C-alpha cells in the first residue's frame, strides 16, 4: 500500500443500490457519501497521498432534474457541514471539471472549499464534478493557443486540470467494465479493477 501514490474511483451503483434497498436513488447517493468518507479515512491510515472520485460526469446532465438537484444539494450541504473537519485533518480538496455550467451557489461552495484547503498536505482529494476527460484534453489544447509547434504530449499533460501524479490504480464499482470518459489520458498505464459490488457496499 505504501508504494501507492494515487488511487481513483468511479463510484457506480449508488442509484441502483437505493432501489435495491426498496428506497430511492437519492437514498443511494446519500449512502454513497459514507463510502467516500471511509475511503478517505483509509487513505489517511495507509498514507496514500492522493485519491480521486468521479462524482458527476458531463454526461450526467441527462439524468432527471430532481436527481441532479439532490446531488448538488448534497454536495453543498456536505462541504458546509464538514469543512472544519476537512481542515482539521489537513485534507486538500481539488475540483476538476468545467464549473461554468454549475449554479452560482454550488460554484461558490466548491471554490471556497478549494481556497480554504489549498495549503493542506496530509491528503489530496480530487473530486471530478461536471467532468469529462475529452473536455479536459480539449481545454488543455486550447491553452496552447492552437500553436502546432507547442501541441505535444508534454505540453498537453502540463495543461491538464491538475499537475499531479497519475493514478496507480483505478477501481470501478457497479459491474460495468468501462471508463465512462474518466481520466482517459491519465489512465494510460494504470492498473484497472472492475468490482461487481455497488458503491455503497
Which residues does each PLM region occupy?
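Flexible, compositionally biased loop and terminal segments
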Residues: 1-201
Amino acid at each position: 500500500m505504501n508504494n501507492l501514490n494515487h488511487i481513483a474511483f468511479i463510484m457506480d451503483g449508488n442509484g441502483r443500490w437505493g432501489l435495491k434497498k426498496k428506497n430511492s436513488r437519492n437514498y443511494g447517493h446519500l449512502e454513497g457519501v459514507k463510502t467516500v468518507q471511509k475511503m478517505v479515512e483509509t487513505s489517511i491510515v495507509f498514507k496514500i497521498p492522493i485519491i480521486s472520485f468521479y462524482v458527476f460526469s458531463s454526461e450526467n446532465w441527462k439524468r432527471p432534474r430532481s436527481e441532479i438537484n439532490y446531488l448538488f444539494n448534497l454536495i453543498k450541504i456536505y462541504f458546509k457541514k464538514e469543512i472544519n473537519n476537512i481542515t482539521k485533518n489537513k485534507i486538500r480538496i481539488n475540483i476538476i471539471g468545467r464549473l461554468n455550467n454549475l449554479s452560482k451557489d454550488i460554484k461558490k461552495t466548491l471554490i471556497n472549499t478549494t481556497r480554504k484547503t489549498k495549503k493542506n498536505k496530509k491528503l489530496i482529494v480530487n473530486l471530478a464534478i461536471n467532468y469529462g476527460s475529452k473536455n479536459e484534453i480539449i481545454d488543455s489544447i486550447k491553452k496552447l493557443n492552437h500553436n502546432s509547434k507547442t501541441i505535444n504530449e508534454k505540453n498537453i499533460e502540463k495543461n491538464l486540470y491538475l499537475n499531479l501524479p497519475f493514478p496507480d490504480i483505478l477501481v470501478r464499482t457497479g459491474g460495468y467494465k468501462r471508463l465512462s470518459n474518466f481520466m482517459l489520458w491519465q489512465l494510460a498505464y494504470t492498473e484497472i479493477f472492475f468490482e461487481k459490488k455497488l458503491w455503497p457496499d
